[in-house]
């Protein structure tokens, strides 16, 4: 009897405490979306949006991921939702995308409240295909975070232009009576922001007079899309030699990096199989041999954790389906050449082809652009011109070598660098790996010769122009292919110790 009362009272106290936690969490969030029905049978999900605000959503305990995603899209009034996803971290600090077909509680183990982040999942290969102004605005916010966190590297000149577009979109036209050069120091655009860069941004901002926020954001995206690592979803892997490599998922295929050097590209049409088992990822690629016959090559990579391996596999499946197919693969389809073994996972959303063909911009939409986070202003030691716009002579001091944090953008400076203040962003570190042993790379010449005829590119010299796009290949994807297919000279790929060649 006593044990019965203990269990009953204990459960009641736990329910009361959970209810208090939900209310407290809802008060902390900027927006609270209550659940319909019995309030005792709900879970609380807290979603951080790209503009820095939080939304607290109450859902039934057995709610699936799609229900939460639909609530967020309805809250934002976002039509082009297929480019976005909800991301969360597991107990092993592995990032995952919320699966809309599975229960939230079965995926997100840490909670309640269950904390997730709205992120761009698929970077459009052609931002001009984005129909809605709100979608372009969210893309700009995501790219700002990518650049600020260091995930997306950006040359000095490009960083200055993008930052100037940000100022134009947020502050409007430059006003001599209101704006001074010190104003730029209140914003954060890059991980290491020097005074020279802020002066260059200030001068560039003057040139964009007359652009509306929507025009400035469109120009921002059209500039950012040419960055080498734009839209590349990086995953750190290990080869059998123990060295770190990176696989980058793109609209055209899978890039392979050794450190920061691009050493190969597997085009999606040439990848015949992609499997995983525990923490081992297997990639099977076909290419033409000397007699013109197709020959299979198997590459094996390992990850630190089985969950990270499955996450990489799922991301590859989704990228292939979103950018390459006209429609998602049906579950009852017998064509399972690309997706094999035990997982039943299938990409169920719209493809980019469907999104660009079916979505139409609404005649009138309204949304609020939230101001960026401001920091304390600093006094510039070098004054900028506040009169007629002139060319700033920053580029006369460009150095060929980077020497310390002050030279991070290749600019020689005579004034001290004031580092950026702390910024809360989602950081995804790029790999830093030592070079592979020379004896592991003797096979490169033969592979490089084969690559000039096949569909996969490995080189000891500069690469030849990319191969023609397959039939029915979207034109904008082919354009993105041409941009990303290049590799640096003297590149190497891990030797036979790292790969199993069948």
Curated annotation (Swiss-Prot):
SMART domains, alphabetized: B41, FA, FERM_C
Subcellular location: Cytoplasm; Cell junction, Adherens junction; Cell membrane; Photoreceptor inner segment
FERM domain location: 43-327
GO biological process: actomyosin structure organization
Region (Disordered), start-end ranges: 359-391, 430-470
Keywords: Cell junction, Cell membrane, Cytoplasm, Membrane, Phosphoprotein
Distribution of this protein across tissues and organs: Expressed in the retina (at protein level).
Residue numbers carrying Phosphoserine: 433
Topological relation to the membrane, as annotated: Peripheral membrane protein
Span list, region Required for interaction with CRB1: 29-119
Name assigned to this protein: Band 4.1-like protein 5
Originating gene: EPB41L5
